[in-house]
């Protein structure tokens, strides 16, 4: 039988190790990117390193836009706004009780051209949603209760529903917040600089600094590797334990089979002596049988006194039979062990 617990632990250890290596490589890549301390230096850096493609840089600044979006509920101005609306209701389940559920009614997203500005210059940002670490903040969360119309309430109740209301959530990338972006720096046809996702290489958008990103990736890499070592040790332990148990079980079965064969041979020898001898020899063999009783083939100490159902064999004592699941003679499954009284 395959030790699935140990195999699963080893596979988990391999997956965690690969995650750790991936995080470690990402941290090493971020350490090699060109840091742009001031955005006005980007033009000079592009001219010096124009032969390097893609030219990966790390820039920092505050989010800005010429045409920001004003959120409807919170009034926050942002460059990316996502709005979702969920209908919340109670419904009848199969047991007849009411359970709460929800359904998505609306999912809308808006984005305007935006840039990073550090006071010295600005750089436009393209495709930030596909970047690692990109996240929007919750601008507002409003719950609008459903109207109490008698007709509508009756129809919903007949359908097994009770409308609670609509939950509207606005997520926004507000203007003015500081961001760090790691990506490919390019110069477009009209002479403006922009940061975009490279064909190969890292692409990060985060509110953390570059040093914090590298530190976090290093911590995750070490954590994954430590967890991988733990799962490896546990998996090896479980597999080794299974192998040892299997070896001991096979040895026990061989010893048990040897005991059964020895007992059967001894019993056959005694029966042959009793059938071929005279009455005196029968008496002598009876004495021998009394000297060598019908012992349990397991412990070889107690007389066998348990009959196995359904096979009908009797070769063990009641104490040993309580630990068996199959008959030592025919290997059939034991449904019941019945104690017998011998005279």
Curated annotation (Swiss-Prot):
Protein name per its UniProtKB record: E3 ubiquitin-protein ligase SP1
Knockout or disruption consequences: No visible phenotype under normal growth conditions, but mutant plants show increased disease symptoms and cell death after inoculation with an avirulent strain of Pseudomonas syringae pv. tomato DC3000. Pale-green phenotype with low survival rates during de-etiolation. Hypersensitivity to salt, osmotic, and oxidative stresses.
Primary gene name: SP1
Pathway: Protein modification; protein ubiquitination
Induction: By infection with the bacterial pathogen Pseudomonas syringae pv. tomato, and treatment with fumonisin B1, a mycotoxin inducing apoptosis-like programmed cell death (PCD).
Post-translational modification as stated in the protein's UniProt record: Auto-ubiquitinated.
Record localization: Plastid, Chloroplast outer membrane
Chloroplast intermembrane-side segments: 22-222
Chain ranges of zinc fingers (RING-type): 296-331
Function: E3 ubiquitin-protein ligase involved in the regulation of protein import in the chloroplast. Associates with TOC complexes and mediates ubiquitination of TOC components, promoting their degradation via the ubiquitin-proteasome system (UPS). Plays a role in the reorganization of the TOC machinery. Involved in a mechanism that regulates plastid biogenesis via UPS. Promotes stress tolerance by depleting the chloroplast protein import apparatus, which limits photosystem assembly and the potential for reactive oxygen species (ROS) formation.
UniProt superkingdom: Eukaryota
Domain notes: The zinc finger domain is required for E3 ligase activity.
Keyword Transmembrane helix recorded: yes
Recorded topology in the membrane: Multi-pass membrane protein
Record's keyword annotation contains Membrane: yes
GO terms classed as biological process: protein ubiquitination; regulation of protein import into chloroplast stroma
A single GO molecular function term of this UniProt record: zinc ion binding
Subunit and interaction comment: Interacts with TOC33, TOC75-3 and TOC159.
SUPFAM superfamilies tied to this protein: RING/U-box
Catalytic reactions of this protein: S-ubiquitinyl-[E2 ubiquitin-conjugating enzyme]-L-cysteine + [acceptor protein]-L-lysine = [E2 ubiquitin-conjugating enzyme]-L-cysteine + N(6)-ubiquitinyl-[acceptor protein]-L-lysine
Keywords for the protein's UniProt record, in alphabetical order: Chloroplast, Membrane, Metal-binding, Plastid, Plastid outer membrane, Stress response, Transferase, Transmembrane, Transmembrane helix, Ubl conjugation, Ubl conjugation pathway, Zinc, Zinc-finger
PANTHER family: E3 UBIQUITIN-PROTEIN LIGASE SP1-RELATED, PTHR47568
Cytoplasmic side: 245-343
One GO cellular component, as annotated: chloroplast outer membrane
Organism the protein comes from: Arabidopsis thaliana
Enzyme Commission designation: 2.3.2.27
Xref: Pfam families: GIDE, zf-C3HC4_3
